[in-house]
Each structure stands twice: as C-alpha cells, then as structure tokens.
A protein has these predicted regions:
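Residue position in alpha-helical solenoids
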Residues: 103, 107-110, 124, 144-147, ...
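C-terminal boundary/linker of central alpha/beta nucleotide-binding cores
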Residues: 1-62, 71, 75
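Helix N-cap/loop-to-helix boundary motif
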Residues: 94, 111-115, 149-157, 191-199, ...
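A eukaryote-biased feature capturing mid-to-C-terminal, repeat/solenoid-rich segments of large proteins
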Residues: 23, 60-88, 93, 114
Length: 467
C-alpha cells in the first residue's frame, strides 16, 4: 500500500478514492498508522491527503521511487486528462491531477522506454498552463533522445517543436531557436520528405527571431517557408495565412504600415474563406489589423478591430488566458492614444483594460515575463500623457528591469522603454537620468538600423544638451 503513496501528497480525498480504489476505511487506517495526514481547509468537501512529513522523509526521500510502482496511477491520470475536451485545463479536479503529475515526475528515474509517457505528461501540463513543469519533462525527454540516439524521427520532431513552443511561452528565445534548429537538422538528416513540416518549422523559427528583434533573419526564414510551399505546391491555407500574418508583424515593427496591413488582410481573407474557420487565428488577424490602424492613428478603426478580436477570444479561452490580456492591453492602448489626440475620448476608458490585463499576466506568466513588461509600459504611457511623470517613470522602470533581465542587451523593446524613460526624466528636469537612458536607446537603435526611432532619440538628446 505504501508504494502508491509516492504520488498522493496534496491530492483531494475524492481523487484518492477514485484513482486508487481506496475506500474511507482504507484511508482512515492509513491515518491511524501515521502514513498520511488529512486536513480540511474549507470543510469536508475540500479534504486533502498528505504524506506525514516524517514518513515522507524517512521512507520516500530515502528510497528510489519507481515509475513502474505508480504506473497504473499515472496512466489513469493521463487517460482522464487526455479526455478533457477543453484546450486549456482549468477545473479544480484536473488541476489537482496536474499538480500530482508535475510533482511525481520529479521523483522518478526515466529511461527511453518512457519517452512517449513523458511527452504525454508534458502536453497535459502545457494545457494546464504549467509551462515550467511542461518544459522540464520535455528537456528530460530530449536528454534521453540524444543519449539513446533514437530512430523515431516523428517523436524527435514532436519533442523539438513542442519544446520550442514552450520555450517561447517562457520567453527563453535562445533555447526556442536551438530547439527549432535541431528539428530542422533532424529533418535534413532523415532522408525523408518532410517538406510541409519543414516549412512550418521555418515559419515558427522566424517568429522567434522576430521576438528576439532579429527582423532580417526572421524575414529570411519566412521567405524560406513560402518558397518550400511554392516549389512543392503545398495546399495548406493555415500555414500560408500564418506566413502572411508573420510577415505583417515584421513590417509593422519596421514601421512599414502599408505592407503590414496588406499581409494581415491576405491572412484574414484566407482564414475566413476555409471550410472550417479557425476562430483563434481569425482573432489574431483582427487583432493585428487593429494594431496597424492604431499605429496609423485611426483609433476608431483600431478599437473596432481589437474588440472584435477580444470578443472571439473570450468565447474560446478561459478568463485567465494570457491572450485575453493581450487584447485587453491593446484596447487600453487604443483608448490612451485616442484620448491623447481626440477630446471625444477619455483616459479613464483605458485603465480598466490595463488593470485587468496586468492582473492576468502576473497570475499566469509571472512578474518577470516580457508580456508583463508590456503592461507596465502601457500603464506608464497612460500616466505620462496625463502629466503624471513620476508614476510613468515608476512603471517604465519595472518594464525596463524585466526586459534587461529577460531579453538580449540590444533588443528593440529595451531601446523603446529606454527612450520613454529618457523622455519622462526630461519632463521633470532630471537631465542626467534622461541622458543615461537616451544614450542606451540610441546605441541599440543604431545597431538595429531603426532610423526613425534613432532620429527621435537624437532629437531628445539635443534637448538634454540645451537644458
């Protein structure tokens, strides 16, 4: 009986009974023997089973738990969670089980025979928004794959692609690049025809390069993906629309708004025309089109498109999904920019969107994630445009701290927030601080050939010299 206890710490009593077929008398016997302890934080319905700390230290931590000893238990959990219809696992029962998977996984010694099991667990943890735990399983699996020199090409590609996706969510772009490049090498060495798969990976790699502010390399990968599609006459509307969309993102980052909008519209038209439209991707198109209109100062159009995207996302995602936060924050930006330029709009319309977006990001992604930094930048701008410069600087500094920690030193987003800090410090006549941040922005912008941004920064540096 005690062999199964390696996986039960913190599990609710009703799950303990369901998955191990233990009845109340069994549980009571274990409690009397001090194998387990029971607590009821919110009454009997929330009763939880925990290993007694002394038993855990003496029996569990000083032995080598075997995956086989708990395999029935683990497989029942996986079977149950795989059957969940939702893309994101969020109900309390499933979350309890995901916690068990994550914690149990730290205790077992895996071999190459368990690669499929580990991959299944990683996917389940991804769906439950447990990104670090999911990535831990994937990296363990990749270590085994590389050590054993597996011939299972499909499994290798699945591991590399999923590890890349999770690393992107964790904002570890260099690791994501490594995983996708390993997938490309695997395909090239396989001697098999993976043309469509290769095009997809090139597109994903381009997205990571864009996130890492490597725009020319990103465009190169998108072009490679499109060339593979054209040469091999691949009919894949989803992939083709993704490439158009991703090129649009590059062009908007380069301030080439006409090309950005043209690519976004092509992506939208393809996504809306297929037999079974993917609402998630259509929402992305609406969101991105709204962003172009925002940059073109067409705020009414921007708000319309961004709200269309939010409406779809709220239908298909749980309330705490980070993509909801992206929509909320962008609508807040729309209202902020509109209020700055048009008296018929009001700044107060923006703040509720910012506050909710920040709350979601801190809860699901953490305080030090790049998306959380975007929330702080947006809130800082909201204060700045209202003349609240100290509050703006406070939020800008939080944003800068995150970006310096997470992103590469010469990232465009670090330059952007450094410029905003210089601008705010100049407003309160703190010339030394203003110049310090503007010089950092200038250095990065020059290295990235951001001509328009560089001109604005150099203009403010001249103002510093005159003050």
């Amino acid at each position: 009986m005690n062999l199964s206890l390696t996986s039960i710490s913190g599990i609710r009593q009703r799950l303990f009974k369901q998955f191990l077929d233990y009845n109340n008398s069994d549980i009571n016997a274990l409690i009397r023997q001090s194998w387990i302890i029971q607590n009821r934080p919110n009454g009997p319905a929330s009763s939880q089973i925990h290993l007694h700390p002394v038993i855990k230290a003496a029996v569990i931590n000083n032995t080598e738990p075997s995956l086989e000893k708990c395999s029935v238990f683990i497989n029942k959990i996986i079977e149950f969670l795989k059957a969940a219809s939702a893309d994101v696992i969020e109900d309390s029962m499933s979350n309890d089980l995901c916690d068990v998977l994550a914690n149990a996984g730290l205790m077992f010694k895996y071999t190459s025979e368990h690669l499929g099991l580990m991959y299944d667990i990683a996917l389940i943890l991804w769906r439950s928004l447990m990104y670090h735990e999911s990535y831990s399983y994937l990296t363990k699996g990749l270590e085994l794959l590389n050590k054993e020199s597996s011939d299972d090409i499909e499994l290798q590609l699945s591991y590399y692609e999923t590890a890349g996706k999770v690393a992107v969510r964790l904002a570890d772009y260099e690791k994501a690049i490594t995983h996708y490049q390993s997938a490309i090498t695997t395909i090239e060495n396989s001697g098999q025809d993976f043309s469509e798969r290769l095009a997809t990976i090139y597109d994903k790699l381009g997205v990571v390069m864009r996130k890492a502010s490597k725009y020319e390399q990103a465009l190169d990968y998108f072009t490679k993906a499109q060339n593979i599609i054209d040469i091999n006459h691949i009919k894949n509307p989803e992939l083709t629309s993704d490439i158009y969309n991703d090129m649009g993102v590059i062009y908007i980052n380069l301030d080439i708004f006409d090309k950005a909008l043209a690519n976004y519209q092509k992506a939208r038209e393809i996504r809306e025309s297929v037999e079974n439209p993917d609402l998630e991707q259509i929402a992305y198109s609406y969101h991105n089109i709204g962003t172009v209109y925002q940059r073109q100062k067409k705020y009414a159009d921007a708000i319309t498109w961004h709200k269309k995207a939010l409406e779809i996302r709220q239908e298909i995602y749980p309330d705490n999904e980070p993509i909801i936060a992206a929509s909320l924050t962008m609508i807040g930006n729309d209202y902020t920019q509109a209020a700055k330029n048009d008296s018929s709009y009001h700044f107060n319309d923006a703040f509720e969107y910012f506050a909710k977006g920040l709350e979601i990001r801190k809860l699901t992604l953490g305080e030090t994630h790049p998306d959380t930094a975007w929330s702080y930048q947006s809130i800082g701008l909201w204060h700045f445009y209202q003349g609240e410069y100290e509050e703006a600087i406070e939020n800008y500094l939080k944003c800068l701290s995150i970006r310096k920690t997470i992103l590469q030193p010469s990232h465009a987003y670090t330059a952007e927030i450094s410029y905003l800090l210089g601008e705010a410090y100049l407003k309160i006549n703190q010339i030394h601080s203003a110049k310090e941040h503007l010089l950092l922005a200038e250095k990065i912008q020059a290295s990235l050939h951001k001509v328009k941004a560089l001109e604005k920064t150099q203009h403010l540096l001249k103002e510093c010299s005159l003050s």
